Amino acid sequence: MEQERHEFSIDWAGRKLTVETGQLAKQANGAVLVRYGDTAVLSTATASKEPKDLPFFPLTVNYEERLYAAGKIPGGFIKREGRPSEKAILASRLIDRPIRPLFPEGFRNEVQVISIVMSVDQDCSSEMAAMVGSSLALSISDIPFEGPIAGVTVGRIDGQFVINPTQDQLEKSDIHLVVAGTKDAINMVEAGAEEVPEDVMLEAIMFGHNEIKRLIEFQEKIAAEVGKSKTDVVLKQVDPMLEQEVRVKAEEDLKQAVQVPEKHARQDAIEAVMDKVLETYEDNEDVPLSEVNEILHKIVKEEVRRLITVEKIRPDGREIDEIRPLSSQVGILPRTHGSGLFTRGQTQALSICTLGALGDVQILDGLGIEESKRFMHHYNFPQFSVGETGPIRGPGRREIGHGALGERALEPVIPSEQDFPYTIRLVSEVLESNGSTSQASICASTLAMMDAGVPIKAPVAGIAMGLVKQDEHVSVLTDIQGMEDALGDMDFKVAGTRKGVTALQMDIKISGIDRAILEQALEQARKGRMIILDNMLEAISESRSELSPYAPKILTMTINPDKIRDVIGPSGKMINKIIEDTGVKIDIEQDGTIYISSADTNMNNKAREIIEDIVREVEVGQMYLGTVKRIEKFGAFVELFKGKDGLVHISQLAEERVNKVEDVVKIGDEILVKVMEIDNQGRVNLSRKAVLKEQKKAEEQNQK
């Protein structure tokens, strides 16, 4: 049956948001075209007919960029879009996180949500349009989904909050917050900020949630009008008789095992109990071992959550608001420009800071305006950090997301290009993992920059907060470890300085949390951050006053912008010659600022002298000691300084008549000449005769 096309509109932050259904991608379970300004995103949701035999919910969320959306053709030989950009990967995670908690417990059908950006307006966020589209595609489909959800961007300009700020407004904003949630609660936060106090961040989140409620009402109307009836699906459930039987065999032993303080010893104790129980069912073909295993994990989860919420006991014996033992060190690696090692319990990160010339910036060319990035933070998570083996691959979504979070946390304290004309790359190597590795990498990266001599505005530390909510019992945990993250309800990462917050990231596994829990988590995080900063500053109290001897030295000079082409030369001939002769890197800005960099200060100075000679202006009436470079019948060409020469006509070589140029000068001779004129073609006319006359006149006056 042919679906009827429907269109719905609402004003969203001063721009029109339009949703179209029933025309595109009609074979998907749900599909909508979302138009926001001139941005257009097609969002679809599909699900497998049968559940998968998996211990987890197989959900995939993809945000896909098409360069035609920005009127661009992909580069390279293939001329097709390649692997997703970092922005697309982060957008996929941004949409996935608020959607994932809202599917029924035990739902195992494979679900795929895809948003394709088909047209992009830089002032109308395609990510926010895709989030609304993904929620709507699920809401109008027959796939079980306890939404809708919505998300908005919040900025703050001159103390006033702004919904979905434009590009120009974002430049002036000290907050860049994305908040998502349901009508009743918030379930995802992602933010960067310029040392903003916790109470302001909380108000920004609540301000965003008020706008979310309006968008959800809009979606509910659409779903009521065009939505399909939800399919009755089989939710995975365990046999209650089997569960009771397994509990009798394992419950008491597992309760003791989960309270072993050390991570690996605790894992070994839990696995020993599980293996013992599983062995009793190995010969029983009527009982699936996967189901027994699921029951055993359920018992562990219940006991850990009960201990935390009711008895206020954590797996490693800490208090609810207690941080694990801390250690901070710098200068770990001798030849790197800066290094920092941060350890928190059984989580350890080693960060390395590398300084480069401004020519080492990363060029970002996607759907947005081409930009360059001079500060980068990369995060690596090798398998040995958790004592396991596994394939070695490039960075996945998680690594890219954690690297971006660290970058967002540290960016507000990076010195300006004028104050510190370097490209800065940080690489965080996670060496041990037991929760909060992204926050450990932020602490280690701060230490590495201070060790490298980067004049950061203030040190930054990060901490991860957790939540376990069971009936009327609620516990907000400071500095969560791996088990608390896996079995808890929230992972709320907060990074900042003593002054305020620089980054937030919140993911939850329940439908949402309220203001009171957010407020408590932010305050506990602030207190924890102060303790961590104290520990870091014991290792290094301020950035080193000098850079590493192995870091490039950068010399800055300014020339007349009109002279830039002279420094570059035809087809880059001049600048390439300077680089070849001195071994330096040269970066030239449009305003005439030149950055010369190398490890050798002498070579920097040599390159500067060459450039100074190139841009030096010849002044009429001035005398110069030049070198004869070429001889013609009509005169001699004399180089006054590097890149600038002039002609001494044969008649201007001497006071007496000259028959042959070689009678007076030869190539390589140094002669004193005077600039007589510069013609309208820029040619310089010189005279040796005028110099001789002035010298003769001066001698006569001295004799008198």
Swiss-Prot record:
| Keyword Nucleotidyltransferase included in the entry's annotation | yes
Subcellular localization is given as: Cytoplasm
Domain S1 motif stretches: 621-689
Under the heading SMART domains, the entry gives:
KH, S1
Catalysis performed (reactions)? RNA(n+1) + phosphate = RNA(n) + a ribonucleoside 5'-diphosphate
Q: Say yes or no: keyword Transmembrane present.
A: no
Q: Which GO terms describe its cellular component?
A: cytosol
What this chain does, per the entry, is described as: Involved in mRNA degradation. Catalyzes the phosphorolysis of single-stranded polyribonucleotides processively in the 3'- to 5'-direction.
UniProt-recorded name of the protein:
Polyribonucleotide nucleotidyltransferase
Instruction: Please report the organism this UniProt entry assigns to the protein.
Output: Halalkalibacterium halodurans (strain ATCC BAA-125 / DSM 18197 / FERM 7344 / JCM 9153 / C-125) (Bacillus halodurans)
Name the gene that codes for it.
Answer: pnp
